[in-house]
């Protein structure tokens, strides 16, 4: 069974997310644990957490298919001490929110070194992750591959491996693969050889069991453009045929697919339908 969903709004409460996920044709989801554009975050009440867990059970959503995504302001690679410290403290709070809700996975962008260099940036990320992981429990941090722009760290999977290898609690660090970001950074998933190379790289660097989520996004720009502009499924440069190649791999089918395509719930429902149309159109076998 394909595990698919989208990044869902929490404006009406965490407990609305499971129902809204089912309404768009999904069985998986990603949410922000708080207002993503704020340094402020608070734990949900006991009542809110209980209602959320009840709705998860009611709608049959597996906890392995539920994810949080860290806020936009966090930058563990920042050379600015105040931003780095605020990022660490907010990430700790996000981990606590995930634990309260029962969500096991928290996705983060590693961060931007802001021109100070990859090595220094990775050192700061590792120090930040150690501070977070050594003072929290349970939640697994997912390092997401990012676009090659603005001093970003993580546009190559080797950079994510460097980070994971250096943290104290490697068992609490896994990865997310974003199809737009990867395409933007030169990973061509529109060809069978490209997907095979990607899977081989993930296996050799992390082990495929460490790939916990796929951010399923088309790209507004061509391969290697380094623009980081998501597009709706089938409407960008990856396209229907490209996604058909990607979807045909069993290793890809085993991982939850989360849409971060333009639009809201209505558009995401259409994109989920498009995914299954591609699977049917190209005769892709699905377990």
Curated annotation (Swiss-Prot):
- State the top-level EC class: hydrolase
GO term, biological process aspect, one: base-excision repair
PROSITE patterns, sorted: AP_NUCLEASE_F2_1, AP_NUCLEASE_F2_2, AP_NUCLEASE_F2_3, AP_NUCLEASE_F2_4
Catalysed reaction(s)? Answer: Endonucleolytic cleavage to 5'-phosphooligonucleotide end-products
Instruction: Write down the InterPro entries for this protein, in alphabetical order.
Output: AP_endonuc_2, AP_endonuc_F2_Zn_BS, Xyl_isomerase-like_sf, Xyl_isomerase-like_TIM-brl
Q: Where does Zn(2+) 3 bind?
A: 181, 228, 230
Positions annotated to bind Zn(2+) 1: 69, 109, 144
Provide the E.C. number(s) assigned to this enzyme. 3.1.21.2
Q: Cofactor binding mode, per the note?
A: Binds 3 Zn(2+) ions.
- Binding locations of Zn(2+) 2: 144, 178, 215, 260
Return the Gene3D superfamilies for the record: Divalent-metal-dependent TIM barrel enzymes
Keywords assigned: DNA damage, DNA repair, Endonuclease, Hydrolase, Metal-binding, Nuclease, Zinc
Family to which the UniProt record says this protein belongs:
Belongs to the AP endonuclease 2 family.
Concerning NCBIfam families, the annotation shows: nfo (TIGR00587)
This molecule's function is given as: Endonuclease IV plays a role in DNA repair. It cleaves phosphodiester bonds at apurinic or apyrimidinic (AP) sites, generating a 3'-hydroxyl group and a 5'-terminal sugar phosphate.
Entry protein name: Probable endonuclease 4
Q: Which organism is it from?
A: Thermotoga maritima (strain ATCC 43589 / DSM 3109 / JCM 10099 / NBRC 100826 / MSB8)
């Amino acid at each position: 069974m394909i595990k698919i969903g989208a990044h869902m709004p929490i404006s009406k409460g965490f407990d609305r997310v499971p129902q809204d996920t089912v309404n768009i044709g999904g069985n998986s989801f990603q949410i922000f644990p708080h207002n993503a554009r704020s340094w402020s975050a608070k734990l949900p009440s006991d009542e809110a957490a209980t209602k959320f867990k009840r709705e998860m059970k009611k709608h049959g959503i597996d906890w392995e298919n539920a994810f949080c995504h860290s806020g936009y302001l966090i930058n563990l690679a920042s050379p600015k001490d105040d931003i780095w410290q605020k990022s660490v403290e907010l990430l700790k709070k996000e981990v606590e929110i995930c634990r309260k809700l029962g969500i096991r996975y928290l996705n983060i962008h590693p961060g931007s070194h802001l021109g100070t260099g990859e090595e220094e940036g990775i050192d700061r990320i590792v120090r930040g992750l150690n501070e977070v992981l050594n003072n929290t429990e349970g939640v697994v941090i997912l390092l997401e591959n990012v676009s090659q722009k603005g001093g970003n760290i993580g546009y190559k999977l080797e950079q994510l491996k460097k980070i994971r290898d250096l943290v104290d609690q490697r068992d609490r660090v896994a990865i997310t693969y974003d199809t737009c970001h990867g395409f933007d950074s030169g990973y061509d998933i529109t060809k069978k050889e490209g997907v095979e190379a990607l899977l081989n790289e993930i296996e050799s660097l992390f082990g495929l069991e460490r790939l916990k989520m796929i951010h399923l996004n088309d790209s507004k720009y061509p391969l290697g453009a380094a623009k980081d502009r998501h597009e709706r499924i089938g409407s960008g440069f990856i396209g229907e045929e490209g996604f058909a190649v990607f979807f045909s791999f069993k290793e890809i089918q085993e991982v939850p697919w989360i849409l971060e395509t333009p639009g809201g719930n209505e558009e995401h429902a259409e994109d989920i339908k498009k995914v299954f149309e591609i699977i049917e159109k190209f005769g892709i076998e699905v377990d």
